Amino acid sequence: MSGNVCNRCNDGLMVNYPFLSCQKCIYLAKKNNKCLGVSIKGKHCPYKPNSNCGNIFCKNHTNQFRLHGKAHTHKLCSSGNDCFREDVTIKNLKQILPIDYPFAQCETCRNNERSYFNNKQQRVKQHNAESKDTMICKKCFVELPTNKFPKTSRGKISHYCKSCFDKRAIIERNRIIDPIKERERSKKYENRPDIKQKRKKYRQCKVVKIRNAISLKKSREKLRAADPENYLKKKAEQQAKHRQKYPEKNGITTIRYNTISSDKYMRYKSVAIEKGLEFTLTKQEFEKLVESNCYYCDCKYKNTINGIDRINNNVGYILDNCVTACSMCNNMKNTLNVETFIVMCMTIANYFKYYRTDIFVNVFNNYESASYNNYKNRALKKDLEFQLSNKEFKELQQKPCYLCGRKSNDKHTNGVDRVCNEEGYIPTNCRSCCGDCNYLKKDYKLDNVVFRCAFIALMHKNNAKKLQDDWKPSRFHESNDKKLSKEENREIKLSIRENKEKQRKKSVEKSVSKLQNQLNRLLNKNTIEV
């Protein structure tokens, strides 16, 4: 532009020179009857000038003609759109802006571009929320599979593809290259009148907010101190209503427990205290265990972490007594020892012909089946359909267990199990089942249980002989002698609650003190009027 160089020959121009081209180029263009305009690539226009453009520029370079003579005080909008529409017959006309206008594009083009970009970002956001398989990058708008997107430092999936993510990381690292220049730029920005006014308005609003926050905290403390029981009861009712209103937020705690090792660590520690068990695992040891594959089935879920199982249920959470276990294996094992659990799984896998081995019948415990009336009453309590007759019930008891093949005898009687736990006690859904297999299956689907037993059997097939030799009897739901009594548990909970209450009061006092200091600092500023 003017003040720099000529747009045709690149010779230097004077500072306040009003034209785009030097006098020599203007003279030659008029002499040769050629347009004075220059294309974007820097080539001279080969067309003849138009009378509507002062016989200097052709019709294609109307914008340059409009700027001709005032290039030292004005500039053209740099947008690719036609934003000046006073003359409809001529296309691609640009707005002429003052030379000191802070932006390269006019306000209309900036609003259009902003609106277009916001709509595009909204479509990307909607797609990323609805689609689970693919995501669109917020920067380059490339659609890729979800697993191609990197994770942030907090473990969440980034909204940017790998290329854009790396570029942003480099920009962030090199953001402050020269601290002195950055400080000068910051001072210049802060001294702007509009920024000063914004800061003043913000401080005034901040004073009101801080005062409200202090009064709210103090009033809550007074209400709680006056009648703690009714206060907590009222808050509990409010939370219950909130949970009913927003049911999608209820599973956040479960998600955190299944994905964040620190949350799981604290939960395991508190359960160990309630059960009266020793807990010596460090956070690092715990994290290493839960992020490993399951010791029993060698499985690891994609989006969740595993848990921990104690080899000897009479010993606490000591490193030598702990192995990694997925939730299904942990629930199936219950209080059985390792040898009994694995051999039971081998027996079930063998019965379904997924694994070949000897039948370890001796590891199964003897049970006395519940009576027909007990089954019927339990079905009524659970609101389940019950269509079995007494004769059908007894016939089922005499059949072999449908999971391990064990039969009833003088010391043991099989019971009845529902294959699909969502259906009731109807003849097509009932099978004969021994007590151990019934406890092991729990509420899982039959196929899942059988396949999991097959995984466990194949995982430990090389140790089958050793497992049988080391086997010692164990049962489901064995009582824990070290478990605290209800009174002891209540005392521990009360002490924990008292400590939490003390910490809460300290936190409130600290928060109020911090807010008061902020308020005093704001009131002491000379720029604010209160």
UniProtKB/Swiss-Prot annotation:
Keywords per UniProt: Coiled coil
Coiled coil is among the record's keywords: yes
Coiled coil: 485-529
Keyword Coiled coil on entry: yes
Highest taxon listed in the record's lineage: Viruses
Protein name: Uncharacterized protein R423
Upper lineage: Viruses, Varidnaviria, Bamfordvirae, Nucleocytoviricota, Megaviricetes
